[in-house]
Regions:
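Gram-negative bacterial Sec-dependent N-terminal signal peptides
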Residues: 2-22
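An N-cap/entry alpha-helix motif that binds or orients negatively charged groups
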Residues: 26-102, 209-220, 224
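Conserved, mostly hydrophobic/aromatic
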Residues: 53, 112, 133, 192
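N-terminal active-site wall of soluble small-molecule enzyme domains
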Residues: 96-109, 118-130, 146-159, 198
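Hydrophobic faces of well-ordered beta-strands that scaffold small-molecule active sites
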Residues: 110-113, 138-142, 162-166, 190
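Active-site mouth loops of central-metabolism enzymes
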Residues: 111-123, 164-172
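Alpha/beta enzyme core
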Residues: 117, 131, 177-224
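Active-site-adjacent beta->alpha loops and helix N-cap segments on the catalytic face
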Residues: 123, 142-160, 169-177, 197-209
C-alpha cells in the first residue's frame, strides 16, 4: 500500500468505520511474549514462518518482482566484514559504542529503520519495537503505514527519542495532519521517503492473494 493509494485507502477506511467493520476481527496476530532462543537470523526466520499466516509472512519477508534487489542487498551486506584489531593496547573496559545522531546521544551506532505493519507479526506491533529500542538506548522510527499511532508510540517511548517516516501524499491535508501529529507528540526527526511514487510489484503477495488485514492507525485517524 503506497502513496498513490492513499486517498482510496482513506475513503475505504471511512466506509469501514461507518459500517462497523474492524480489521482486528479478520486477523489474529500472535500475543506470545517470551525469551527467544536462536542461533542465527536464518533459523529465527524459519521458526517465524512456521507460526505466521502465509500471506503475512510473505509480505514481511518478501521484496518486489523477482526479488533481485532483495538478494543483491543481502549479498552486499554479507561482504561487509568486521576487521579484528588486536595488539592495539585497547582494553575491553575501554570500548564504548555510544555516539550521537542529530545531537541525540545513542548507546549504540545502530538505529531501527521504519517498517510498516508490524502488527502482522505481533499484536503489540510497533509498540513492542519502540519499547525494545528504548531499552537499548537507540532510536525507533515509525512508518506512515504503522499499525499504531504516533501518540501511542510516544507514550511507550517515554523520554527515548523516536523518528517518524513520511510517505509524501498527493493529499496535502493528510501531509499537514500527520506532520502536525509528529510535532505534537515529540518526534525528533522526519524521515521523508521519496523513492516510492508507485507501489512495488510484489509477486509473493500476488501468489498469496495477500490483502492487508489490519488497519493503518494514522490513516484511520485522518479518516475520522
Amino acid at each position: 500500500m503506497k502513496t498513490h493509494h492513499l486517498i482510496r485507502v482513506v475513503a475505504s477506511l471511512a466506509m469501514l468505520a461507518t459500517s462497523g467493520l474492524a480489521y482486528a476481527e479478520e486477523y489474529k496476530a500472535s500475543t506470545d511474549e517470551k525469551a527467544i532462543k536462536m542461533t542465527n537470523v536464518a533459523s529465527l526466520e524459519a521458526r517465524v514462518q512456521a507460526k505466521m499466516e502465509k500471506g503475512a509472512f510473505g509480505y514481511i519477508r518478501g521484496g518486489a518482482e523477482d526479488e533481485n534487489n532483495l538478494r543483491s542487498n543481502t549479498e552486499s551486506f554479507d561482504k561487509k566484514y568486521i576487521m579484528p584489531r588486536v595488539l592495539q593496547g585497547i582494553e575491553l573496559k575501554e570500548i564504548d559504542l555510544s555516539t550521537q545522531l542529530l545531537g541525540i546521544p545513542l548507546k549504540t551506532p545502530i538505529i531501527q529503520a521504519p517498517m510498516a505493519a508490524q502488527g502482522l507479526a505481533h499484536a503489540s506491533g510497533e509498540l513492542a519495537t519502540a519499547k525494545g529500542m528504548a531499552q537499548v538506548g537507540s532510536i525507533f522510527s515509525l512508518s506512515t503505514y504503522g499499525n499504531k499511532t504516533i501518540e501511542e508510540v510516544a507514550n511507550v517511548s517515554g523520554k527515548n527519542p523516536f523518528f517518524f517516516q513520511l510517505y509524501m501524499s498527493k493529499n496535502n491535508q493528510f501531509n499537514e495532519f500527520i506532520l502536525a501529529q509528529a510535532v505534537k507528540h515529540g518526534a525528533k526527526a522526519i524521515i521523508l521517503t521519496v523513492d516510492s511514487p508507485v507501489g512495488g510489484y510484489r509477486e509473493e503477495d500476488i501468489k498469496n492473494n495477500f490483502q492487508f488485514p489490519l488497519g493503518f492507525a494514522n490513516l484511520e485517524m485522518f479518516a475520522r
